[in-house]
Regions:
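Short glycine/threonine-rich loop-to-helix capping motif typified by GTGT followed
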Residues: 87-95
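Small-aliphatic-rich amphipathic alpha-helix that forms the alpha element of a beta-alpha
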Residues: 56-79, 95-103
Length: 110
């Protein structure tokens, strides 16, 4: 299956209006007069960051790319949810995460 075939298969599953045909990586959910925008980007070692990179920088980039998606939609962040798989190298990641969250005044929600 090619990447385009894979995306087409996902689009067939994403029938909820908030998915907007998977036009981008943000979902837009309407609650009466309020709008909630959700986004989630994943980063893969060797693709989005190199093994020798500082994990503090990796954490920074992970949050920043998601905050950028929200900004592109004109949304202000309520907070971020983070997941990662880094083995035993958590300290640097936590330091970078703390820094980027403080810089953008965005709370960690989970």
């Amino acid at each position: 299956m090619t990447e385009l075939d894979f995306i087409a298969a996902l689009r067939a599953l994403a029938t909820q209006p908030a998915a907007r045909g998977l036009a981008d990586d943000a979902a837009v959910i309407e609650f009466g007069t309020e709008t909630l925008i959700l986004t989630k980007d994943m980063m893969v070692e060797g693709v989005h960051w190199l093994p020798q990179q500082s994990l503090a920088d990796v954490a920074w980039k992970l949050v920043a790319v998601n905050l950028s998606d929200l900004a592109a939609k004109g949304a202000a962040p309520v907070g971020v949810l983070v997941s990662h798989m880094l083995g035993d190298a958590d300290e640097g990641f936590v330091a970078g995460l703390r820094e980027v969250l403080e810089t953008y005044a965005t709370p960690l929600l989970g």
